[in-house]
Each structure stands twice: as C-alpha cells, then as structure tokens.
Amino acid sequence: RTQMVGLLLPSDFIGRPGRKFAPFTVSAVTDVRLCCFRSRPFANLIEATPHIAQRLLEMTLDELDAAREWMLLLGRKTAREKIASFLAIIARRYAALAEGAEIGGMGVHLPTPQKLSFDLPLTRESMSDYLGLTIETVSRQISALKRDGVITLEGNRHVSVPNLDRLLAEAGDDSEDVFHDSAAE
C-alpha cells in the first residue's frame, strides 16, 4: 500500500539543504525537469544572497501551511470535500505559478480569476492513494462534481473550474478564502 504525504508541483523544492538523507522517498508521477544543487555551493549561495535565503524560508513556511491544510483535509472532510479540496489546491498552485511567469507545457489556462482550467498531475489511482480513498470513491466523487456543474472534464485529466468560489464552497473552506489570499501575494 502506498501512502503519499505530499505533492510537489513546478517550482517546488525537494529535500532540505544540509541533510545527507531525506526521511522519505520522492517519486515522479509525471515527467519532470529537475535542477540539482551540490550542498556546499548551495549553502554558500544562500549565505551570499539573502533574498534567496528569504525565499527558501518562505517556501518552507508554505510547505508547513500545506501540511496543516493536508491534516485538516484528511481528518475532517467528507470524500466529496476531499476531492474538491484537492482540485482547489491544484488550481491555487497553478494559478499562483501562472501569475508569476508564463507556464509552458503545463496545460494551465486562466481566462478570469473565477474561471480556470488545468491538467491534473495525478491519475485516479494516485489520487486515491493521496487522499486515502478508494479509486471507486474518487471516480464517483469526480463524476458527481462534474454532474453538479462544479467542474467540467476533457478526457481523464483536463479539469475546468467555471466558478472557483463554488469549488471552494464544495471543499468546505468557509473559514477563509485561501485561494484569493494565496494568489494575491
């Protein structure tokens, strides 16, 4: 049985500087372009370039926020809310990336702040591992979100979200608008 504890997307950082070994395995589920840094030159770069150190700290804090969000998702949400939350997380991440730079080959389209589309990075089977659900439940819940007009699908992986606020409502994220807060930074 596979237990996925995180999902990295373009621009994410893998591993921790200064550690010889990671306490986990990282597996790519899609094609990746990876940039590797040698430990000592990277440490020197961070010391010499404070804004890179600051950005690395911000990325670490973002990862901590994501882990907290993930604990909430796994512990308190229904299957439908888990699927909607997963889609909202992916949408939020791709939208934030698209704001910062043109995304080549990622299949992301942001026509308006409320409507967006993207390619899912995971298969239904990988989503089931990631969300702690059966593959049948993942498929049923995606079909239900599609039937209810929350999302549209082209093929198995291309998702369009006609109304982001509706997806966030389905995710049960009523405490704060995490998408708009994150995308505004």
Predicted regions and their residues:
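Cyclic-nucleotide recognition modules
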Residues: 4-69
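Short, polar/charged, Gly/Pro-enriched helix-capping and turn/loop motifs at alpha-helix termini
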Residues: 52, 67-70, 74, 97, ...
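N-terminal positioning helix adjacent to the helix-turn-helix/winged-helix DNA-binding module
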Residues: 75, 79-82, 86, 123
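Phosphate-/nucleic-acid-contacting segments
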Residues: 92-185
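Amphipathic, well-packed alpha-helical segments that form the structural scaffold of globular domains
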Residues: 61, 65, 84-92
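A short glycine-/small-residue-rich loop at the edge of a beta-strand within enzyme catalytic domains
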Residues: 47, 51, 70-74, 78, ...
